[in-house]
Amino acid sequence: MKLNSQDLEKIADLTLDCYNQNAEHFWEGTRYHDVSQNIAAMLQYIEGDRPFTILDFGCGPGRDLRVFAELGHVAIGLEGAAQFAAMARAYSGCEVWQQSFLKLDLPENYFDGVFANASLFHIPSQELPRVLLELRACLKPGGVLFSSNPHGHNEEGWSYGRYGT
């Protein structure tokens, strides 16, 4: 079933509302998750000299954003949920852009890496090719897009108040 623009807006709004309402609980449940292997996997494939300019796509409360900054990189977060964006700024000290994943406004050829850890699965499947092209366009030549997503059951729809694919 093809989703229209109103359906897509509703999906984004309700998912972001869920995260905004549960931001502190989510943070307490994920603050100490170790994703160092994911960070290392992306960084090892970026060519050129460090520091790299990294976009943490769906940065949440800023856990990974802070790690990139502590490693000496220029880290910028992108987050749709206002509560998470504020938390990420406070926790990481990094710049955070608040944008919907479905309405991105990204500079072209700007980032050495895009780190999309447990975030792209929130994009409805019909929109995913477009969003991936936009993420590709924001990468410098030779830039790396890293994506990791939670294991699911190959279903698209609502789960715990959030939309996922």
Where are these regions (language model features)?
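Class I (Rossmann-like) S-adenosyl-L-methionine-dependent methyltransferase catalytic domain
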Residues: M1-F57, P61-D105, Q126-R130, E134, ...
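A short acidic, Gly/Pro-enriched loop at the edge of an enzyme's catalytic core
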Residues: L102-V114
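Conserved glycine-rich acetyl-CoA-binding loop
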Residues: N109, A137-P141
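A short beta-strand submotif of the Rossmann-like class I SAM-dependent methyltransferase core
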Residues: A116-S119
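Helix-to-beta-strand junctions that scaffold the AdoMet/dcAdoMet cofactor pocket
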Residues: I123-S125, L139-K140
